[in-house]
């Protein structure tokens, strides 16, 4: 475990960055090498939830942030705040990464869990990019549940969170019957 940290700056070179620390919790679930949830540390690695809040940002301003993970700072990621008095959210329903498991691919093969997650994550990325291009003044993203098809498959959550666009927006999710 390590203390979660984020730093925020006005320039990509991170000069003058302000650092914020947060909290980290360990969940009672562990992730196996196959990306599924298991019940003990002997069967897999611990799952950590890190939370950091950055304060003092101004509206209509472009910032860059980095997160600290495994002893290193990430690449600088850009985000732009919008008008604080007027909000625009995009609402998505059922991204459900992994839902095409068991369906046939374009090559005629039955899709396994990993292939289905990859396929659905690709389509989710296209959907997200298209929606954001059509709505450039979006403040945050919302989903109405079912981010994944199976809550025990970490790789499905990774597919949901993978699009680059997810790094620059606040996200609010609702738990669906598959989550």
What does each model-found stretch correspond to?
Residues 1-179:
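Divalent metal-dependent phosphoesterase catalytic cores across multiple superfamilies
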């Amino acid at each position: 475990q390590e203390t979660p940290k984020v730093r925020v700056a006005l320039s990509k070179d991170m000069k003058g960055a302000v650092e914020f620390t947060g909290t980290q919790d360990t969940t009672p679930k562990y992730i196996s090498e196959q990306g599924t949830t298991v019940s003990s540390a002997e069967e897999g690695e611990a799952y950590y939830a890190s939370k950091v809040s950055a304060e003092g940002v101004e509206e209509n301003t472009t910032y860059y942030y980095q997160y600290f993970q495994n002893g290193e700072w990430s690449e600088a990621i850009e985000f732009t705040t919008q008008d604080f008095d007027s909000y625009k959210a995009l609402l998505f329903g059922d991204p459900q990464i992994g839902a095409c498991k068991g369906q046939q691919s374009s090559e005629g093969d039955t899709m396994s869990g990993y292939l289905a997650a990859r396929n659905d994550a690709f389509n989710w990325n296209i959907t997200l990019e298209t929606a954001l291009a059509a709505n450039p003044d979006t403040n945050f993203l919302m989903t109405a549940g079912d981010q994944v098809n199976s809550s025990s498959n970490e790789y499905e959550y990774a597919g949901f969170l993978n699009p680059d666009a997810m790094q620059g927006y606040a996200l609010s999710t609702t738990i669906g019957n598959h989550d």
